[in-house]
Amino acid sequence: MKVKAPGRINIIGEHTDYNDGYVLPFAVNRYVFLSIEGSERFIFHSENVNETVEMEKIEKLNKWTDYISGVIASFEKRGYRVSPVKISVSSNLPIGAGLSSSAALEVATAYAISEYFGFNVPKLELVKIAREAEVEFVGVRCGIMDQFTAVFGKKDHAIFLDTMTLEYEYVPLKLEGYEINLVDSNVKHELSSSEYNRRRQECEEVLKTLEKKSFREVTKEDLERLSGTLRKRAQHVLEENERVLKSVQALKEGDFETLGKLLFSSHESLRDLYEVSCEETDFIVDYLRGKEGILGARMVGGGFGGGVIVLSKKGAFGKIKEELVESYRKRFGIDLIFHEIESSDGVQKI
């Protein structure tokens, strides 16, 4: 049996998903492909890594197999019996560009196991199983957006998701005359995982200081009671949530000019208040600002490298792409990687 699960790109709502905030992602047309069959022991094969790993029972190896093993462990924790299987994976999802290849692998595994063994796990439960694999087994304290999008994605739509209640709404993504590109900065600073966890701690500090249970209870007035770093972090989360709401409205009205401006202001906030951008992604966004037909751009993902999402009029980005490549190479000695992004449905059999 074969399945595929998509990556995702988040239009706006960065570093809000673990703060009970709003996000606006869509599933993209790049996938993790996975096949599953019965076996004497657990065998996991990755075409991309060109490696096969065998094990008698599920164990943590601190490598790519943990995403698969973690999902199996999540099923077993819930009382499902997963007998040994051979799982083979391949992917055309770029790693480290902010398209969430790990969540796609987790969701592909969860869906394949549910279908293969006839568990018929509901969609939302699949999301939770996949996320639990990353948080508890792999050990990355991610929010729920990535796994949610890989399961619930719908072609030609973005998902307006409230990460606190998990209520969601499909918002039509009518891009006629416009396009979305992803520019991969081709850098990943070592800080990324340690700083990501530090931002989470800082946000928890904010709640402790304000004696609130959730960021949803935090108001603009509360910012007055904070100072320094904590104030900056809280201000980003509050304003980014507002930007998501405005972006949903703009998408519904087909107002891409407004959406573009919101992307630029999101980047400024991630740079100045949340302090997770880096010289390379700042350079890309600054370069694009004011160029003809470019409506907006911002860093995507955890930060400290990774990708930049670009919203433009159709064809406009292609005209300045070469200049951008040259300028970036001259400045950093690194080649950019480009991905034109289209929307996709969520996980499915193939």
From Swiss-Prot:
Known function: Catalyzes the transfer of the gamma-phosphate of ATP to D-galactose to form alpha-D-galactose-1-phosphate (Gal-1-P).
Enzyme class: transferase
Pathway(s): Carbohydrate metabolism; galactose metabolism
Residues of the active site: 146 (proton acceptor)
Gene3D superfamilies linked to this entry: 3.30.230.10, GHMP kinase, C-terminal domain (3.30.70.890)
Catalytic reaction list: alpha-D-galactose + ATP = alpha-D-galactose 1-phosphate + ADP + H(+)
Keywords per UniProt: ATP-binding, Carbohydrate metabolism, Cytoplasm, Galactose metabolism, Kinase, Magnesium, Metal-binding, Nucleotide-binding, Transferase
Residues annotated as binding Mg(2+): 102, 134
Site feature Transition state stabilizer, where: 8
Name used for this protein in its record: Galactokinase
Record-stated family: Belongs to the GHMP kinase family. GalK subfamily.
InterPro entries registered for this protein in UniProt: Galactokinase, Galactokinase_bac, Galactokinase_CS, GalKase_N, GHMP_kinase_C_dom, GHMP_kinase_C_sf, GHMP_kinase_N_dom, GHMP_knse_ATP-bd_CS
Intracellular or extracellular location(s): Cytoplasm
One GO CC term, this protein: cytosol
BP GO annotations: galactose metabolic process
Any one GO molecular function term: magnesium ion binding
Positions that bind ATP: 46, 96-102
Binding residues annotated for substrate, in chain numbering: 14-17, 196
Protein EC: 2.7.1.6
